Amino acid sequence: MAAVLFALLALALLRAGGASAAAGTVTTSVQSGDSWVQLTCTLNTSAAGVTGHRWLKGKEVVKEDQLQGLHTEHNVTGDDRFGKYSCLFLPKDTGEATLTVDGPPRIKAVKKSEHANEGDSVTLLCKSESFPFVTAWVWYKVADSGDQVIQNGSQSRFFISHSEAQSELHIKDLDLTSDPGEYACNGTSLQGTDAAVVTLRVRSRLAALWPFLGIVAEVLVLVTVIFIYEKRRKPDEVLDDEDAGAAPLKSSGHHVNDDKGKNVRQRNAS
């Protein structure tokens, strides 16, 4: 008896789940032009009332409304229209569907120029903003004699790591002569290929010391100027002191002569 009741309960749950799934069925449509895409989702039936719609690109919400219709659209223009989208009918679990907009890969350098010191390590980074995802990454150094493909682990200094969305080139123990230049990252997907360029500049080990040496030189020049100025000023001060000391002696001599003259006149008068 218990087994029969369990079977009936399971059957009821399956029917309820099937009814719910049927109620949440969503049909999708993707229409595109040269630079635009129109995404459409239609909820066929719904046991519960729709309170709104939400559109996502990946995990980012790009549009949301509180309309109650069983139909929703999202229009996208520009180069960033490619990717994976989702439409959701609210409240949650009312209905949901996924739409994809395929396009050629668009490879971008996170930083178009990198600066590092000789002997240090540096990381060059490229990312892909496209769908389908990049399936193959290649790094090479741009040269007049021909592009040089960089293999992972080559010279024990070049290491490459990548995922579907980005690729990194790690260079260790930078060489001032051979490492500076332009590095290109190439990404290929089912829709095509694209590349971006990163310029690497390597500074000498002494480059960081130049500002400090400049400050030291300025201080030395200033000290030298002050020393010369003080040395030239001291003889003038000594001469001024000697002149000031001789003046009182000359004045006292005049007083002595005046006193002698008075005594002579007094004697003559007597």
From Swiss-Prot:
The modification Phosphoserine is found at residue 252. Disulfide bonds join 41-87, 126-185. The chain crosses the membrane at residues 208-228. Residues 239-270 are annotated as: Disordered. It holds the Pfam family Ig_3. Keywords: Angiogenesis, Cell membrane, Disulfide bond, Endoplasmic reticulum, Glycoprotein, Immunoglobulin domain, Lectin, Mannose-binding, Membrane, Phosphoprotein, Receptor, Signal, Transmembrane, Transmembrane helix. It comes from the Eukaryota. SUPFAM superfamilies: Immunoglobulin (SSF48726). Signaling receptor for cyclophilins, essential for PPIA/CYPA and PPIB/CYPB-dependent signaling related to chemotaxis and adhesion of immune cells. Plays an important role in targeting the monocarboxylate transporters SLC16A1/GLUT1, SLC16A3, SLC16A8, SLC16A11 and SLC16A12 to the plasma membrane. Acts as a coreceptor for vascular endothelial growth factor receptor 2 (KDR/VEGFR2) in endothelial cells enhancing its VEGFA-mediated activation and downstream signaling. Promotes angiogenesis through EPAS1/HIF2A-mediated up-regulation of VEGFA and KDR/VEGFR2 in endothelial cells. This is Basigin. It comes from Oryctolagus cuniculus. The lineage of its organism: Eukaryota, Metazoa, Chordata, Craniata, Vertebrata. The gene is BSG.
